[in-house]
């Protein structure tokens, strides 16, 4: 659990499966490809390994499991074509819109660290600009050139890059730079949780119930003094965690 008297100054978010229900679409389109090769649907245990990883890394997981005759890039390209028709129907996850609005209204710095590449990010959010415009320039996508190849989640780089953007914005406003320990990172995937913890941030893990159940005895390795879990973003209490009365420090 979080320390009782700690107050955080910024909130950083993953996107897929946390802010938008894209994981349902990912699973559906993956199963369409697997079915074409006569393979079984994607099991939750493999799905858990894919979540939070950049596209090519996630593709490698499913290819290694299924032995389908595709390269990771071929798999990514095929999924891109199939998924394109679904993105316009993508819906926010419960509590996501209200939380982002609440943070924005209180002047809390927010940022987005998504493994989605820029093209996918734009397609997923085109009809949700009223939510994602709140992040301003504090967005790093999985194909951002500042993230070295092979350094996506579970490495900490993407969170630290987003924090750099937040601090650049704070400097322009005459505010002090924040350290990772002053930030909360919201994640739904295990690789993402590991990534944010490695960055030195406090983590709020909002997992799919099936993923959480799959973890079993390893739960204590994930949920510790640096990480806690919530069933939904709607359960997050900003007054408990955030320094909303002295945000200009």
Swiss-Prot record:
The protein's matches in CDD domains, at most eight in alphabetical order, are given as: HAD_AtGPP-like
Q: Name one GO biological process term.
A: rRNA catabolic process
Family of this protein: Belongs to the HAD-like hydrolase superfamily. CbbY/CbbZ/Gph/YieH family.
Question: What cystine linkages occur within this chain?
Answer: none
Which InterPro entries does the record cross-reference, listed alphabetically? Gpp1/Gpp2-like, HAD-like_sf, HAD-SF_hydro_IA, HAD_sf, PGP-like_dom2
Pfam families linked to this entry: Hydrolase
Q: Which GO terms describe its molecular function?
A: phosphatase activity; pseudouridine 5'-phosphatase activity
What is the protein name stated in its UniProt record? Uncharacterized protein C4C5.01
């Amino acid at each position: 659990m979080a320390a009782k008297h700690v107050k955080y100054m910024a909130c950083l978010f993953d996107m897929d499966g946390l802010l938008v229900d894209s994981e349902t679409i990912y699973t559906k389109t993956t199963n369409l490809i697997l079915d074409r090769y006569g393979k079984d649907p994607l099991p939750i245990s493999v799905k858990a390994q894919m979540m939070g990883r950049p596209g090519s890394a996630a593709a490698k997981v499913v290819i290694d499991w299924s032995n389908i005759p595709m390269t990771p890039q071929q798999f990514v390209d095929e999924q891109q074509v199939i998924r394109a028709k679904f993105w316009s129907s993508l819906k926010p996850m419960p509590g996501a819109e209200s939380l982002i609005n609440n943070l924005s209204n209180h002047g809390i710095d927010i940022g987005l660290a998504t493994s989605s590449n820029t093209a996918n990010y734009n397609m997923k959010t085109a009809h949700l600009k009223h939510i994602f415009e709140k992040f301003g320039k504090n967005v790093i996508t999985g194909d951002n050139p500042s993230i070295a190849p092979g350094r996506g989640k579970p490495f900490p780089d993407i969170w630290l890059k987003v924090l750099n953007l937040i601090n650049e914005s704070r400097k322009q406003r005459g505010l002090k730079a924040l350290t990772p320990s002053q930030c909360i990172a919201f994640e739904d995937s295990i690789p993402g949780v590991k990534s944010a913890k490695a960055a030195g941030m406090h983590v709020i893990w909002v997992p799919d119930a099936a993923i959480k159940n799959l973890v079993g005895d390893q739960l204590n390795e994930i949920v510790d003094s640096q990480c806690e879990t919530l069933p939904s973003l709607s359960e997050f209490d900003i007054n408990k965690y955030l320094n909303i009365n002295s945000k200009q420090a």
